Each structure stands twice: as structure tokens, then as C-alpha cells.
Amino acid sequence: MTRSLKKNPFVVDHLSGKIEKLNMREEKEIIVTWSRGSTIIPAMMGHTIAIHNGKEHFPIYITDQMVGHKLGEFSPTLTFARHTRNDNKSRR
């Protein structure tokens, strides 16, 4: 289900505070966060946010096309481990 339009987009308070401070000082630095459920808002555009994927922080540069999506959509958590081929020729 999508979020109701009556409500504001969800952004963790400490993340929005960091972005507001950087925008006021007009600085660009990497913001580290574990909040994958926060929505990308227009104030985040132009910043690099390092999103935790369960193992490490994955840096993502926020563009205008990402506004409205969640941060976790751009930091994959699973890596596909391919099964070994059952190749009978290699066994001979």
C-alpha cells in the first residue's frame, strides 16, 4: 500500500536535520545512515548519502529522478550466488 497523501513523506529526524544543516552552510559531504525506509525529498538532491545494506554503507548520489522513492531501493541487500554448472565434460 502506498502512503496517504494527507501525510508527509517519512524521513528520520536526524537525517533531515543533517541535510538542513548542510543546505544552510551550502556544503557537500557524505551522510552516513542506516535508515533505508526514509523517503527521498527534494532537499536531498545533490547530496551523497551512504546507505547501509546490512554489511557496509553504499554511497548514492541523489538526483531529481530519485525524489519520492525510498533510500533502500538504491542499496541492494542481496548478492546472487550463482549455482555451479553441472557440466559432465569437466569431470572427465
Curated annotation (Swiss-Prot):
SUPFAM superfamilies: Ribosomal protein S19. It comes from the Eukaryota. One of its GO terms (cellular component) is chloroplast. It is found in: Plastid, Chloroplast. InterPro entries: Ribosomal_uS19, Ribosomal_uS19_bac-type, Ribosomal_uS19_CS, Ribosomal_uS19_SF. Coiled coil: none annotated. Keywords: Chloroplast, Plastid, Ribonucleoprotein, Ribosomal protein, RNA-binding, rRNA-binding. GO terms for molecular function: rRNA binding; structural constituent of ribosome. GO terms for biological process: ribosomal small subunit assembly; translation. Belongs to the universal ribosomal protein uS19 family. Protein S19 forms a complex with S13 that binds strongly to the 16S ribosomal RNA. This is Small ribosomal subunit protein uS19c. It comes from Dioscorea elephantipes.
